[in-house]
């Protein structure tokens, strides 16, 4: 099953995340199928590829709770 989830980047104390489509059995920082945007929790900044996110959801991808919150805040869900 494909999930939309966060992939951790950055360094200790200055973490950013990329929103990616991944197999649910992959590791958190494992190989992603597709990168769909990023999220910076320190500044609450996010950049999303809306067309690709909608396409992935239509194909059956399930967002995690945190990604669902980010998408709802951006009025995608």
Swiss-Prot record:
Pfam families: Ribosomal_S16. It is found in: Plastid, Cyanelle. Its main location: plastid. It comes from the Eukaryota. SUPFAM superfamilies: Ribosomal protein S16 (SSF54565). GO terms for cellular component: cyanelle; mitochondrion; small ribosomal subunit. The keyword Flavoprotein does not apply. Keywords: Cyanelle, Plastid, Ribonucleoprotein, Ribosomal protein. PROSITE patterns: RIBOSOMAL_S16. GO terms for molecular function: structural constituent of ribosome. Gene3D superfamilies: 3.30.1320.10. InterPro entries: Ribosomal_bS16 (IPR000307), Ribosomal_bS16_CS (IPR020592), Ribosomal_bS16_dom_sf (IPR023803). One of its GO terms (biological process) is mitochondrial translation. Belongs to the bacterial ribosomal protein bS16 family. NCBIfam families: S16. PANTHER family: 30S RIBOSOMAL PROTEIN S16, SMALL RIBOSOMAL SUBUNIT PROTEIN BS16M. This is Small ribosomal subunit protein bS16c. It comes from Cyanophora paradoxa. The lineage of its organism: Eukaryota, Glaucocystophyceae, Cyanophoraceae, Cyanophora. The gene is rps16.
């Amino acid at each position: 099953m494909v999930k939309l989830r966060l992939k951790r980047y950055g360094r200790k104390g200055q973490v950013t995340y990329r929103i990616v489509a991944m197999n649910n059995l992959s590791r958190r920082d494992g190989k992603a199928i597709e990168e769909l945007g990023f999220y910076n929790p320190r500044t609450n900044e996010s950049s999303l590829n809306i067309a690709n996110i909608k396409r992935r959801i239509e194909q059956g991808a399930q967002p995690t709770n945190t990604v669902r919150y980010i998408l709802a805040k951006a009025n995608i869900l």
